[in-house]
UniProtKB/Swiss-Prot annotation, chains A, B:
Recorded family membership: Belongs to the DinB family.
Gene Ontology terms, MF aspect: metal ion binding
Keywords, sorted A to Z: Metal-binding
The keyword Transport belongs to this UniProt entry's keyword annotation: no
Alphabetical list of PANTHER family matching this protein: PROTEIN DINB (PTHR37302:SF1), SLR1116 PROTEIN (PTHR37302)
UniProt-recorded name of the protein: Protein DinB
Subunit structure: Homodimer.
């Protein structure tokens, strides 16, 4: 299971980069443009994804969920204000941190107890939760694509099936 | 890996039902309402997800990818015209077919060779591709949430993390 969770995370990095590459092709103002949607703008969506991913690796590294949520809240405003290139860099450095962490195989199946403020304690592992980080990213990439279309622009392909074809067909 | 893929699919069924439950609370016309987004309406998004999922289980059951794509094309118009309750029923029956198929453990790791019209042959297994079915569903649930907000309505929570908390905390 852990190898699969690691591979899914690598897909997540590829999919985020597809979105950044596409956003950098568009007029600069699109990134902060107000759009009536799930979030006020695409920068708000990417900040939310970044701060969630940051929160989870803090939890994986021993922080409590409430401390991780507090950290995210503290960084929210400054993260939302960033420009697309700065955001791309933040995502890149965070993915490097994840990859370093996930390469320590013993981390993947280390038992975790997560105290959720609203629903008690969950006993889990990093490899069980990592698919949530990826699934959460996919969900918000789905938001971003709809928001881009709403603003009149196409998005970028980010399907896991496409990623599998690209990575596996080359090796075939 | 296969148990995890099965569990991820069960999450997908739960997440789809969350969306159907929410859509059924809203004014009936929302389902077919034209919205400038990734698809012309929410019914088009759910039809696309349904026909993709149908296509994949046909491939898992031995059909070629091009035959499965042809089947989806054939059913497209009639699927898009369905009302929300009919769509919910289609999804339910398809998920029962998936669960029956996935309970045959030997199916999960059966070698598959998939001829993609545009990028050659991929050697894979059902359990390796199943996460694509789920990830694809999550992506389009992300579209639907943005489309609902665009139309002025909140969506429903469908996070994998929430699903894990709900299913694991009860058993703790």
């Amino acid at each position: 299971m852990s190898d699969f969770a690691f591979k899914l995370y690598e897909y997540n990095v590829w999919a985020n980069q597809q979105i950044f590459n596409r956003l950098k092709e568009l007029p600069k103002e699109i990134y902060h443009q107000e759009i009536q949607s799930v979030f006020p703008s695409i920068s708000h969506v990417l900040s939310h994804v970044y701060l969630s991913d940051l929160g989870w690796i803090e939890v994986f590294s021993g922080k409590t969920l409430s401390d991780a949520l507090a950290l995210a809240e503290q960084l929210k405003e400054q993260t939302e204000a960033k420009e697309i290139e700065e955001m791309e860099d933040l995502f890149l450095r965070l993915s490097e941190r994840y990859i370093l962490f996930l390469q320590q195989k013993e981390q993947l199946n280390k038992p975790l107890q997560i105290q959720n403020p609203s629903s008690g304690i969950m006993k889990t592992t990093v490899s069980e939760l990592l698919p949530h980080v990826v699934n959460h990213g996919t969900y918000h990439r789905g938001n971003i694509t709809a928001m881009l279309r709403q603003a009149g622009y196409a998005s970028a392909p980010t399907d896991y099936g496409l990623y599998l074809f690209m990575t596996k067909t080359e090796k075939a």
